[in-house]
Amino acid sequence: MSPTQWDFPVELCCRPMAFVTLTGLDVVYNAVHRAVWDAFCANRRADRVPISFKVLPGDHEYPKCRPKRTSYEWYIPKGILKTGWMNKHLNLVPALVVVFYELDWDEPQWKEKQSECATRVEIVRQSLQGRNTKVAVVLIQKKTPLPPGEDVIASERAAALCNACELSGKSLFVLPHTDHLVGYIIRLENAFYEHAQTYYYTEIRRVKSHKEFLNKTTHQLLFVRHQFKIAFFSELKQDTQNALKNYRTAYNLVHELRAHETNILEIKTMAGFINYKICRLCFQHNTPLDAIAQFRKHIDLCKKKIGSAELSFEHDAWMSKQFQAFGDLFDEAIKLGLTAIQTQNPGFYYQQAAYYAQERKQLAKTLCNHEASVMYPNPDPLETQTGVLDFYGQRSWRQGILSFDLSDPEKEKVGILAIQLKERNVVHSEIIITLLSNAVAQFKKYKCPRMKSHLMVQMGEEYYYAKDYTKALKLLDYVMCDYRSEGWWTLLTSVLTTALKCSYLMAQLKDYITYSLELLGRASTLKDDQKSRIEKNLINVLMNESPDPEPDCDILAVKTAQKLWADRISLAGSNIFTIGVQDFVPFVQCKAKFHAPSFHVDVPVQFDIYLKADCPHPIRFSKLCVSFNNQEYNQFCVIEEASKANEVLENLTQGKMCLVPGKTRKLLFKFVAKTEDVGKKIEITSVDLALGNETGRCVVLNWQGGGGDAASSQEALQAARSFKRRPKLPDNEVHWDSIIIQASTMIISRVPNISVHLLHEPPALTNEMYCLVVTVQSHEKTQIRDVKLTAGLKPGQDANLTQKTHVTLHGTELCDESYPALLTDIPVGDLHPGEQLEKMLYVRCGTVGSRMFLVYVSYLINTTVEEKEIVCKCHKDETVTIETVFPFDVAVKFVSTKFEHLERVYADIPFLLMTDLLSASPWALTIVSSELQLAPSMTTVDQLESQVDNVILQTGESASECFCLQCPSLGNIEGGVATGHYIISWKRTSAMENIPIITTVITLPHVIVENIPLHVNADLPSFGRVRESLPVKYHLQNKTDLVQDVEISVEPSDAFMFSGLKQIRLRILPGTEQEMLYNFYPLMAGYQQLPSLNINLLRFPNFTNQLLRRFIPTSIFVKPQGRLMDDTSIAAA
């Protein structure tokens, strides 16, 4: 029996489509016919009707139709389903035969052509004798036909042609060969599809009619057969709902059949076919849960129907195929849009298929283990006359025999032997690997990493059994990384054991050594005797000898491997193998730890290397090297012990390089750092531990950084979480888990022995030359040289501060923008022990706020470390935060000559500018001078002189000045008129005389200037006296270019009598002035209101008395009447 018998037939797996044959087309030599055929077949879209087309000659012989039975009373079926039945109805027996014929309605030789067409149709009918296949005629015409009813000749000839061909009008079609050929073809397809539907409907009714003659005693097989046929025809008819329903019925009928060893394979085969159809249709109907439920039911019903014990491997092969087929269906549905999840995806079915394939392999190994002398039977009992079986699932040596009794036991025995011998030639590993590969791809797609790893291990083992060791190692290496990272040590040990076998059988030296190192380590769960064997083999390899074979290896493979090992030993080449241990868990652990996170350059750098062995026996290493990021230190950190190759495993505990299992070995290293590395990090880049020697083979274990391997991080985490009390160890031993890797340290400068003091008077004032006195004193025991000072604004602050801060050593010069914010490397000479020096630093801060200033002093000094003299560069820095504040606040305001606040001033009218300077400094300030610089638009009424020269202001004190100004008429200026600048020259009172004076410029505010039509001012004494005449003169000045008509009136006051014009109307010419004279006579003492002068301008009605009162006084102080003093009074006084 062929090993491919378990594959489902192609006709079962494909989508059934109506089969239509096309005759009369010469697709090779006729271009028109070729275009018609291409339109039917090429680039068919999914929305076109499901039809399978085939071009056949008109006289093609179709399968003969067997005579119909009138009775099934004496008929005993020989099987359930014939092997050729599905293919026959898919590809051999058409539902419709279409005869293509070139004939136009206006054909001159119509009669002859009609007769020829009828003959062709008759030939087709003869070849379909007994079939219900439909026949149709398509006339290929050159002209586009007229609409129905308009072409009378066409109607008549069409009817005549139908009569001649014995066709109905629905079976005659016209195909014009025009530019719209595809459109006509699609319409033809739809018509063909209707004819095919009719044919399959007829076939379903025909099969159903047979069921009436069946009985369940002798025709059980026919019930299954007919139900399957009805379902299959329904699929061809594209009635998938009815197809599914009938397949379900057929499936139930299969399991109602009486099962025996002789027919169990046929029952399972048909059950598998029908189950496949049911599941496929469920997925097609988008009911995946129904498909899964059906498949589970199918497996539950069939998994115990094993059949012959001698052929039980066939049952596993069948089970494997069931799972694989369902996995394929599931995957196909997903590609068409179905959504799967982690817990329900095709990978589980491929995995189960692989499991049964493995079971098949094991059973075949047991049942097919015949001796080499056993020959394959002749004649071959598995051969048939036609080369294929008549019925699915039957044995070739007893086809059609339904008896449960074996009529010829000898033939049965020979047949079983033939199957077993054929099974022995099956490459099971290839089948298993393919299934596992499919499963891995699915689990990877659905993000199931552990399932993927588990199956990859199985794939690796299958490759090992298939003797493809290279692929096996590739897969196992991939999985080992996952198992190490997750701590699955038992699984890792199993995988490593297989990998070690592969590397041995391939004689791969480096891989063999690597896997041996890990199997000896703490991650391995092997017993001590197994580890001892591996350790011995490892030492043999290092001594350039062949290792002993690994247990349970194939004998022939071992012999081949021994030859390979012998060749490896004889070949000359590199005998040093460097193995990076970061990605696996070797039997030696290493940790590096510096004694401190930083070392001063004048102190030796010290660190320890801790080593611990986990192998069964003490082992001696030959060399230890530590590498740094600065390779000049490598030479100081090497330990080497010469030993012979055969001493590696000797039970010696002497020597630094001999490691005892479970004991921690500590190795101390120290060296003097270079002065150039001050401020740099020294890192241990790698630790190399050599096993063996160069005369044999040498393995160098390389730890990156300060040690640690693939399991270290997980072990450190577990140790940190553990509350278990550690046992007390002797003083010279340490707990391995308590050692923390510290692979880097910092080289820092020697501790300076100087003092740096800063003397200043904060806060700093804006723009002043602020003095900072730096005092440096040496406390070293020897002279220090090349002392340098760096001082100024500390780097890394706001860029705006850098631009507005300037530093200098010369306080007599005022800093400008060219001065830096930081002075670097100012040489200040040498200092003897106890000697000190001072430097004065001047800082100018242009903006307020906090600033951090740095004073950095560096120097050189000679010192001795480990009997080696070095030059150390020491430094000390001090930082100070200085707040910068404004020295004073300046307030400016405009008032009238009456000291009333002004929102605006009036052209040519004097007003007062008042400045108020308030000290905000905590230190006394000296105002050296002040100056008012007027804008061109302003003029002064009197001489401008500073009123605050050399005034000293304490905190909170203020100094004020007053200036009388006026502004000429400038017209209406938007935004007001510029006043000018107020310049203040000042310095800190405590500052030295040579410190420059600071000038602060205050920009005065703009003022709004307005023109008035009439200006009035009054001349009157500063006070009056009761009952004494008080002369008052009013000056009225016309400020316009027009003649002003002025009405003047005086309102009396209770405190005064007056003489003069009480009411008058007068005219004032442009630019001229008019005077009004009055004598006021005070009646009461005190601060009295003057008689009110009211003015009305006829041309300027908006000129109000309220505006007028801004310019003239409204009240005056009146003293009481004085007494005449006589001489006596004077004398008494």
Curated annotation (Swiss-Prot):
CC per GO annotation: cytoplasm; cytosol; Golgi apparatus; TRAPP complex; TRAPPIII protein complex
InterPro entries, A to Z: TPC11 (IPR021773), TRAPPC11_C (IPR025876)
UniProt-reported outcome of changing P381A: Found in a patient with congenital disorder of glycosylation; uncertain significance
Keyword Transport set for record: yes
Major site of localization recorded for this protein: Golgi
GO biological process, one term: endoplasmic reticulum to Golgi vesicle-mediated transport
Compartmental location: Golgi apparatus; Golgi apparatus, cis-Golgi network
Keyword Acetylation: yes
Sites bearing N6-acetyllysine, chain numbering: K245
Chain ranges passing through the membrane: none
Domain of life: Eukaryota
UniProt keyword terms in alphabetical order: Acetylation, Disease variant, ER-Golgi transport, Golgi apparatus, Limb-girdle muscular dystrophy, Transport
Pfam families assigned to the protein according to its UniProt record, in alphabetical order: Foie-gras_1, Gryzun-like
Subunit-structure text: Component of the multisubunit TRAPP (transport protein particle) complex, which includes at least TRAPPC2, TRAPPC2L, TRAPPC3, TRAPPC3L, TRAPPC4, TRAPPC5, TRAPPC8, TRAPPC9, TRAPPC10, TRAPPC11 and TRAPPC12.
Disease implication from the record: Muscular dystrophy, limb-girdle, autosomal recessive 18: A form of limb-girdle muscular dystrophy characterized by proximal muscle weakness with childhood onset, resulting in gait abnormalities and scapular winging. Serum creatine kinase is increased. A subset of patients may show a hyperkinetic movement disorder with chorea, ataxia, or dystonia and global developmental delay.
Family label: Belongs to the TRAPPC11 family.
Function: Involved in endoplasmic reticulum to Golgi apparatus trafficking at a very early stage.
Protein name as catalogued: Trafficking protein particle complex subunit 11
Organism name: Homo sapiens (Human)
